[in-house]
């Protein structure tokens, strides 16, 4: 997502949904790991960061924040670093923005965690082509639903969603799988 290889990422998601959507529950969603630059170094502290962070916490699977990510720390952390070497000050603006935009989503993680009602959509442009840079998906739990739409490219996007991409459903009698699609409405 950082490198905006959106079509590749969406293809992986589609392949998982067509093979077995339950796999999505086992994924760990993260923005960085100890072998990489920190999340704020890779994504900044504004639109890109909060867009990807929103996806991280609203996709099925386990969202995992890196060490110091919410505070905006830039010092790498990992097993080869036994102690902190920098005296970093927490970025209170970044923390407050997490509290406003991300934490409420985490408090409702039950709405996003399951895969039984998770649907990924193609985002169509006015000329009928799929815009692979826009991630559109929905999920539902009991009588609550959520629709997430995020353009992971620094450009204008205009279009619509209607039908989900194909996902497999297991037949309980013979364990065979069938591909189906649903409409947003």
Question: What kind of region is each of these model predictions?
Answer:
Residues 1-6, 33-46, 83-91:
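The substrate-binding groove and active-site-proximal loops of carbohydrate-active enzymes
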Residues 4-25, 55, 60, 64-65, ...:
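Carbohydrate-interacting/catalytic domains
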Residues 21-44, 77:
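Active-site clefts of carbohydrate-active enzymes
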Residues 45-49, 129:
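Short, glycine/acidic-rich beta->alpha junctions
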